[in-house]
Protein backbone atom coordinates (compact mmCIF):
# COMPACT_ATOMS: atom_id res chain seq x y z
CA UNK A 1 0.00 0.00 0.00
CA UNK A 2 1.51 3.35 -1.00
CA UNK A 3 1.88 6.17 1.51
CA UNK A 4 -0.94 8.26 0.05
CA UNK A 5 -3.47 5.42 0.09
CA UNK A 6 -2.43 4.51 3.63
CA UNK A 7 -3.19 8.08 4.73
CA UNK A 8 -6.54 7.89 2.92
CA UNK A 9 -7.43 4.68 4.74
CA UNK A 10 -6.43 6.13 8.11
CA UNK A 11 -8.71 9.09 7.40
CA UNK A 12 -11.65 6.86 6.52
CA UNK A 13 -11.08 4.64 9.55
CA UNK A 14 -10.86 7.54 11.99
CA UNK A 15 -13.68 9.56 10.44
CA UNK A 16 -16.09 6.63 10.41
CA UNK A 17 -15.06 5.72 13.94
CA UNK A 18 -15.77 9.27 15.12
CA UNK A 19 -19.26 9.41 13.68
CA UNK A 20 -20.13 5.99 15.13
CA UNK A 21 -18.65 6.92 18.51
CA UNK A 22 -20.88 9.98 18.76
CA UNK A 23 -23.96 8.38 17.20
CA UNK A 24 -23.95 5.02 18.93
CA UNK A 25 -22.88 6.73 22.14
CA UNK A 26 -25.97 8.93 22.17
CA UNK A 27 -28.23 5.93 21.49
CA UNK A 28 -26.57 4.01 24.33
CA UNK A 29 -27.18 6.97 26.63
CA UNK A 30 -30.85 6.90 25.66
CA UNK A 31 -31.43 3.16 25.86
CA UNK A 32 -29.51 2.07 28.94
CA UNK A 33 -28.46 5.18 30.88
CA UNK A 34 -31.79 6.96 31.16
CA UNK A 35 -30.95 10.01 29.05
CA UNK A 36 -33.99 12.03 27.97
CA UNK A 37 -33.45 12.32 24.24
CA UNK A 38 -36.16 12.64 21.64
CA UNK A 39 -35.98 11.81 17.94
CA UNK A 40 -34.80 15.28 16.99
CA UNK A 41 -32.00 15.35 19.56
CA UNK A 42 -30.74 11.95 18.39
CA UNK A 43 -30.91 13.05 14.75
CA UNK A 44 -28.98 16.23 15.53
CA UNK A 45 -26.28 14.29 17.37
CA UNK A 46 -25.86 11.88 14.46
CA UNK A 47 -25.74 14.78 12.01
CA UNK A 48 -23.26 16.80 14.04
CA UNK A 49 -21.18 13.66 14.57
CA UNK A 50 -20.92 13.30 10.80
CA UNK A 51 -20.06 16.99 10.38
CA UNK A 52 -17.30 16.84 12.99
CA UNK A 53 -15.91 13.63 11.49
CA UNK A 54 -15.80 15.26 8.05
CA UNK A 55 -14.07 18.36 9.40
CA UNK A 56 -11.51 16.16 11.17
CA UNK A 57 -10.59 13.89 8.26
CA UNK A 58 -11.52 15.55 4.95
CA UNK A 59 -7.92 16.59 4.36
CA UNK A 60 -6.72 13.00 4.63
CA UNK A 61 -9.26 11.12 2.55
CA UNK A 62 -12.08 13.37 1.40
CA UNK A 63 -14.15 12.00 4.28
CA UNK A 64 -16.51 9.67 2.44
CA UNK A 65 -17.17 7.70 5.67
CA UNK A 66 -19.75 5.62 3.83
CA UNK A 67 -19.31 2.80 1.27
CA UNK A 68 -22.41 3.96 -0.59
CA UNK A 69 -20.90 7.42 -1.03
CA UNK A 70 -17.55 5.95 -2.10
CA UNK A 71 -19.17 3.75 -4.75
CA UNK A 72 -21.36 6.58 -6.05
CA UNK A 73 -18.39 8.96 -6.30
CA UNK A 74 -16.44 6.28 -8.15
CA UNK A 75 -19.23 5.83 -10.69
CA UNK A 76 -20.24 9.47 -11.11
CA UNK A 77 -17.51 11.78 -9.78
CA UNK A 78 -14.22 10.36 -11.03
CA UNK A 79 -13.09 8.80 -7.75
CA UNK A 80 -10.17 6.42 -8.30
CA UNK A 81 -11.56 2.88 -8.59
CA UNK A 82 -8.40 1.40 -7.07
CA UNK A 83 -9.26 3.05 -3.77
CA UNK A 84 -12.84 1.80 -3.48
CA UNK A 85 -12.14 -1.50 -1.70
CA UNK A 86 -9.51 -0.08 0.70
CA UNK A 87 -11.87 2.76 1.58
CA UNK A 88 -14.77 0.40 2.28
CA UNK A 89 -12.64 -1.92 4.42
CA UNK A 90 -11.38 1.07 6.42
CA UNK A 91 -14.91 2.37 6.93
CA UNK A 92 -16.18 -1.01 8.10
CA UNK A 93 -13.29 -1.45 10.53
CA UNK A 94 -13.70 2.07 11.90
CA UNK A 95 -17.39 1.49 12.56
CA UNK A 96 -16.73 -1.88 14.22
CA UNK A 97 -14.03 -0.58 16.55
CA UNK A 98 -16.03 2.50 17.51
CA UNK A 99 -19.01 0.32 18.44
CA UNK A 100 -16.69 -1.85 20.52
CA UNK A 101 -15.32 1.23 22.26
CA UNK A 102 -18.78 2.56 23.10
CA UNK A 103 -19.74 -0.84 24.48
CA UNK A 104 -16.56 -1.02 26.56
CA UNK A 105 -17.35 2.35 28.12
CA UNK A 106 -21.02 1.47 28.75
CA UNK A 107 -20.49 -2.22 29.53
CA UNK A 108 -21.47 -2.13 33.19
CA UNK A 109 -24.51 0.00 32.40
CA UNK A 110 -25.63 -2.55 29.79
CA UNK A 111 -25.22 -5.40 32.25
CA UNK A 112 -27.12 -3.60 35.01
CA UNK A 113 -29.94 -2.70 32.62
CA UNK A 114 -30.25 -6.29 31.42
CA UNK A 115 -30.26 -7.57 35.00
CA UNK A 116 -32.93 -5.13 36.18
CA UNK A 117 -35.18 -5.82 33.18
CA UNK A 118 -34.45 -9.57 33.02
CA UNK A 119 -33.22 -9.40 29.43
CA UNK A 120 -31.20 -12.26 27.95
CA UNK A 121 -29.03 -11.41 24.98
CA UNK A 122 -29.96 -13.19 21.80
CA UNK A 123 -33.67 -13.40 22.64
CA UNK A 124 -36.28 -11.35 20.83
CA UNK A 125 -36.64 -9.17 23.93
CA UNK A 126 -33.01 -8.10 23.54
CA UNK A 127 -33.48 -6.72 20.02
CA UNK A 128 -34.09 -3.21 21.31
CA UNK A 129 -30.68 -3.21 23.01
CA UNK A 130 -29.05 -4.62 19.88
CA UNK A 131 -30.55 -1.56 18.20
CA UNK A 132 -28.15 0.55 20.24
CA UNK A 133 -25.46 -0.41 17.74
CA UNK A 134 -27.26 -0.66 14.41
CA UNK A 135 -30.62 -0.20 12.75
CA UNK A 136 -33.77 -2.31 12.57
CA UNK A 137 -37.08 -1.48 10.87
CA UNK A 138 -40.33 -0.45 12.50
CA UNK A 139 -42.32 -3.65 13.22
CA UNK A 140 -45.02 -2.53 10.78
CA UNK A 141 -42.58 -2.44 7.86
CA UNK A 142 -41.88 -5.42 5.64
CA UNK A 143 -38.37 -6.09 4.38
CA UNK A 144 -39.42 -4.64 1.04
CA UNK A 145 -40.84 -1.55 2.69
CA UNK A 146 -37.65 -1.01 4.69
CA UNK A 147 -35.59 -1.49 1.52
CA UNK A 148 -37.64 1.20 -0.23
CA UNK A 149 -37.19 3.63 2.66
CA UNK A 150 -33.42 3.16 2.75
CA UNK A 151 -33.18 3.44 -1.03
CA UNK A 152 -35.13 6.71 -1.14
CA UNK A 153 -33.48 8.46 1.79
CA UNK A 154 -29.98 7.50 0.63
CA UNK A 155 -30.77 8.72 -2.89
CA UNK A 156 -31.83 12.06 -1.41
CA UNK A 157 -28.73 12.14 0.79
CA UNK A 158 -26.36 11.47 -2.10
CA UNK A 159 -28.02 13.91 -4.49
CA UNK A 160 -27.82 16.67 -1.91
CA UNK A 161 -24.24 15.83 -0.94
CA UNK A 162 -23.30 16.32 -4.57
CA UNK A 163 -25.27 19.56 -4.71
CA UNK A 164 -23.71 20.90 -1.52
CA UNK A 165 -20.16 20.06 -2.64
CA UNK A 166 -20.57 21.27 -6.24
CA UNK A 167 -19.09 24.78 -6.38
CA UNK A 168 -20.65 25.22 -9.79
CA UNK A 169 -24.13 24.96 -8.30
CA UNK A 170 -24.86 28.38 -6.84
CA UNK A 171 -22.79 29.99 -4.11
CA UNK A 172 -19.68 27.93 -3.14
CA UNK A 173 -20.22 26.40 0.31
CA UNK A 174 -16.56 25.78 1.12
CA UNK A 175 -16.02 25.20 4.85
CA UNK A 176 -19.78 25.17 5.46
CA UNK A 177 -20.33 22.02 3.40
CA UNK A 178 -19.68 19.50 6.23
CA UNK A 179 -22.02 21.39 8.57
CA UNK A 180 -24.73 21.50 5.91
CA UNK A 181 -24.33 17.77 5.27
CA UNK A 182 -24.70 17.17 9.00
CA UNK A 183 -27.90 19.22 9.05
CA UNK A 184 -29.12 17.25 6.03
CA UNK A 185 -28.60 13.96 7.88
CA UNK A 186 -30.37 15.34 10.94
CA UNK A 187 -33.36 16.43 8.85
CA UNK A 188 -33.59 13.02 7.18
CA UNK A 189 -33.37 11.38 10.60
CA UNK A 190 -36.08 13.58 12.02
CA UNK A 191 -38.39 12.86 9.11
CA UNK A 192 -37.75 9.17 8.42
CA UNK A 193 -35.80 7.85 11.41
CA UNK A 194 -38.73 6.01 13.02
CA UNK A 195 -39.14 3.82 9.93
CA UNK A 196 -35.68 2.24 9.60
CA UNK A 197 -33.32 4.16 11.86
CA UNK A 198 -31.95 6.04 8.80
CA UNK A 199 -28.88 3.84 8.24
CA UNK A 200 -28.01 5.18 4.75
CA UNK A 201 -24.53 3.73 5.25
CA UNK A 202 -23.48 0.06 5.04
CA UNK A 203 -20.44 0.63 7.28
CA UNK A 204 -22.44 2.52 9.90
CA UNK A 205 -24.83 -0.41 10.08
CA UNK A 206 -22.87 -3.59 9.45
CA UNK A 207 -19.72 -2.80 11.45
CA UNK A 208 -21.66 -2.23 14.71
CA UNK A 209 -24.11 -4.99 13.82
CA UNK A 210 -21.28 -7.48 13.53
CA UNK A 211 -19.90 -6.27 16.85
CA UNK A 212 -23.30 -6.91 18.47
CA UNK A 213 -23.26 -10.38 16.92
CA UNK A 214 -19.94 -11.09 18.65
CA UNK A 215 -20.96 -9.39 21.90
CA UNK A 216 -23.70 -11.88 22.69
CA UNK A 217 -26.69 -10.95 20.57
CA UNK A 218 -25.75 -13.63 18.06
CA UNK A 219 -27.83 -14.23 14.95
CA UNK A 220 -30.56 -11.91 16.23
CA UNK A 221 -28.22 -8.97 15.62
CA UNK A 222 -27.92 -9.91 11.95
CA UNK A 223 -31.47 -11.06 11.24
CA UNK A 224 -33.41 -8.60 13.37
CA UNK A 225 -35.76 -11.47 14.10
CA UNK A 226 -36.87 -11.57 10.44
CA UNK A 227 -37.03 -14.58 8.11
CA UNK A 228 -34.98 -12.66 5.56
CA UNK A 229 -31.89 -11.45 7.46
CA UNK A 230 -32.32 -7.73 7.89
CA UNK A 231 -28.62 -6.89 7.61
CA UNK A 232 -28.99 -7.26 3.83
CA UNK A 233 -31.23 -4.19 3.60
CA UNK A 234 -28.84 -1.53 4.96
CA UNK A 235 -25.99 -3.20 3.07
CA UNK A 236 -27.61 -3.09 -0.37
CA UNK A 237 -30.35 -0.44 -0.42
CA UNK A 238 -28.05 2.51 0.45
CA UNK A 239 -25.60 1.57 -2.30
CA UNK A 240 -28.35 1.42 -4.92
CA UNK A 241 -29.93 4.56 -3.52
CA UNK A 242 -26.65 6.49 -3.60
CA UNK A 243 -26.07 5.44 -7.21
CA UNK A 244 -29.57 6.57 -8.12
CA UNK A 245 -29.17 9.87 -6.29
CA UNK A 246 -25.81 10.63 -7.88
CA UNK A 247 -27.15 9.74 -11.33
CA UNK A 248 -30.22 11.92 -10.82
CA UNK A 249 -28.13 14.89 -9.69
CA UNK A 250 -25.78 14.57 -12.66
CA UNK A 251 -28.64 14.25 -15.14
CA UNK A 252 -31.14 16.73 -13.74
CA UNK A 253 -28.90 19.40 -12.22
CA UNK A 254 -25.15 18.94 -12.56
CA UNK A 255 -25.23 18.29 -16.29
CA UNK A 256 -27.27 21.44 -16.88
CA UNK A 257 -25.06 23.85 -14.94
CA UNK A 258 -23.20 26.32 -17.17
CA UNK A 259 -19.80 25.60 -15.60
CA UNK A 260 -20.10 21.82 -15.44
CA UNK A 261 -16.97 20.42 -17.06
CA UNK A 262 -17.24 16.77 -16.06
CA UNK A 263 -14.26 14.65 -15.10
CA UNK A 264 -10.88 15.56 -16.44
From Swiss-Prot:
It is a multi-pass membrane protein. It catalyses: glycerol(in) = glycerol(out). The keyword Transmembrane helix applies. Residues 33-37, 107-141, 193-196, 215-229 are periplasmic. This is Glycerol uptake facilitator protein. Keywords: Cell inner membrane, Cell membrane, Membrane, Repeat, Transmembrane, Transmembrane helix, Transport. Residues 1-3, 59-61, 77-82, 168-175, 253-264 are cytoplasmic. Aquaporins contain two tandem repeats each containing three membrane-spanning domains and a pore-forming loop with the signature motif Asn-Pro-Ala (NPA). It is found in: Cell inner membrane.
Amino acid sequence: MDKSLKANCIGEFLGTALLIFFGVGCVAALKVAGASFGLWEISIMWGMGVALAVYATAGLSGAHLNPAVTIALWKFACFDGKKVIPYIISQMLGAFFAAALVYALYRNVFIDYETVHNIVRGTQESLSLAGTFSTYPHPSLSIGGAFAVEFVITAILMALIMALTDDGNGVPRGPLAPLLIGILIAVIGGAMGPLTGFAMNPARDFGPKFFAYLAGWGELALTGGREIPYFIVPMVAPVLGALAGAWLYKKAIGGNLPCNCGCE
